[in-house]
């Protein structure tokens, strides 16, 4: 039952914040309650209100493009052409599309643009079960190559993602490294899902492949040669070890890793900005990291 709840939570990605409740139930030694109403969850209500009340800012414009059949969303500041870009990979357990996630990732894309001064490209990558691995990875790589084709320098690109998108960001960089392709300037992950290797139930994204393939589960990857990484996680989330393990491996491989665990926080709590003070603190950290990465480029 607990494992099933994990998949439900991941599938809803940043839209459902019940991880904190789930972890508290597991830590107490008991199973989750049978009665489990997402609508009654305070964090869900806050996020729904934030998304409903949000108005796209006048100083930015949205452009939806299609690259080889894959939809992507550009967020750019009007009358400004930045040579820096953030490639955002959304969460949702590899089963929820960008459209399924509603306004959440458009809000986050604008937030990335505001704090960085960069343009932001969000990929509506194909999702399981119709499109298992390697579909999402192929689409992330397609977007990255498109940025290079448009003239963006690798050192001017940051790949960012949350939950499944965080794992996908790491998998994308693992692929780039293994194939001697240009690496981005940095990677940012929020509550990344890095280990899909479950004994009892196989995630839909795995398909007929091995779940311990590093391109599916970056938990098993080798991180030597990676760019600087900022990894954030909530202290009370089920996926905490998905961050801690990868951060440790990367640090041992000589990678510059800035890892922050926010006590008492849940899965992808950052999406509750500006309502939640911890979310605002996390975004301030992201801003400082991006400023540092782009400062000499």
Give residue spans per PLM region.
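N-terminal Sec-pathway targeting helices
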Residues: 1-15
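Alpha/beta-hydrolase superfamily serine-hydrolase fold, recognizing
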Residues: 18, 23-41, 48-297
């Amino acid at each position: 039952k607990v494992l099933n709840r994990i998949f439900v939570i991941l599938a809803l990605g940043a839209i459902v914040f019940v991880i904190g409740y789930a972890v508290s139930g597991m830590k107490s030694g008991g199973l989750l309650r049978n009665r489990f109403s997402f609508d009654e969850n305070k964090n869900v209500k806050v996020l729904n209100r934030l998304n409903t009340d949000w108005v796209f800012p006048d100083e930015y414009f949205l452009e939806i493009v299609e690259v080889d059949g894959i939809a992507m969303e550009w967020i750019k500041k009007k009358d400004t052409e930045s040579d820096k870009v953030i490639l955002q990979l959304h969460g949702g357990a590899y089963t929820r599309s960008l459209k399924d996630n509603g306004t959440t990732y458009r809000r986050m894309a604008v937030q990335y643009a505001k704090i960085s001064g960069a343009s932001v490209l969000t990929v509506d990558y194909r999702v399981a079960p119709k499109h298992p691995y390697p579909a999402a990875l192929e689409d992330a790589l397609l977007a990255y190559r498109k940025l290079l084709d448009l003239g963006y320098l690798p050192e001017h690109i940051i790949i960012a993602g949350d939950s499944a998108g965080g794992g996908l960001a790491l998998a994308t960089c693992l692929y780039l490294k293994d194939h001697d392709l240009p690496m981005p300037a940095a990677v940012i992950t929020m509550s990344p899902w890095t280990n899909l290797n479950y004994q009892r139930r196989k995630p839909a994204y795995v398909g007929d492949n091995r779940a311990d393939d590093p391109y599916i589960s970056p938990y098993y990857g080798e991180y030597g040669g990676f760019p600087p990484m900022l990894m954030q996680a909530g202290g009370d989330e089920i996926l905490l070890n998905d961050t801690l393990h990868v951060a440790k491996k990367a640090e041992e491989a000589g990678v510059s890793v800035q890892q922050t665990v926010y006590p008492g926080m849940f899965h992808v709590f950052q999406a509750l900005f500006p309502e939640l003070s911890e979310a605002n603190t996390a975004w301030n950290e992201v801003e400082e990291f991006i400023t540092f990465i782009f400062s000499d480029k």
